[in-house]
Amino acid sequence: MNSTFADQVITFNKNLQYTGALPEGFDVLNPYLDNPETMDVMKKFYHKYYNDSNKRKFIIGINPSRHGAGVTGVPFTDTKRLESICGIKMKSAHTHEVSSVFMYDMIAEYGGPEMFYKEIYINSPFPLAIVRKTKNGWLNANYYDDKKLFEAVKDFMIDSLKKHISLNLDTSEVFILGKKNAGFISKLNKEAQLFDTMTVLEHPRYIQQYKSKEKQLYIDKYILALKK
């Protein structure tokens, strides 16, 4: 029996680990190792929405946040929306994440999670949460925040993107969240020739925090780009 899209994503997540070097002051969190329930809810999510072998469009985030995919194992999905929209309850954690709010408002207008996830797969080039040590404790970090950090994780990111593509993703056009992210993905693409066209969309966190009055405009922009 051929394995489904869901089976392959679950296998990818199960085997996910970063063993490379990191510059001082950075660390990587692996939600699947830190909380056994994360593995359970992630499996439920992919079995629910990805139990087929359809080709899908690929949306690329940055890296999981501690409160979104860093808890649920599902990109741009906090526990609130995992339960209220996807019907999957998480008992060991309760999180609210601004990016998740925008993403699920957009998904609702796209046609709902069944339709959206049937056609689209979201993940990150660095699929684990990165944190940075500050005097106030550990805070979220992006893979591109530090030149040494990017150089350290670059090969791992190319390898991860290739694994995502092998799930059966459409590489003729890829959708990248965040302009700065797109600049770095473009560097990886030059080196590894992964995608033909790169379409850049504003990052959900940026929209929620700085452009909330124009949110509908951005929802329309996403849907227009993804449905064309």
Segments predicted by a language model, with ranges:
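Cofactor-binding loop segments of dinucleotide-utilizing enzymes, especially the Rossmann-like FAD-
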Residues: 62, 179, 203
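An amphipathic alpha-helical core segment
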Residues: 179-193
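Short, flexible loop segments at boundaries between secondary-structure elements
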Residues: 191-227
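A polyanion-binding, active-site-adjacent surface
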Residues: 2-173, 182-186, 209, 217-228
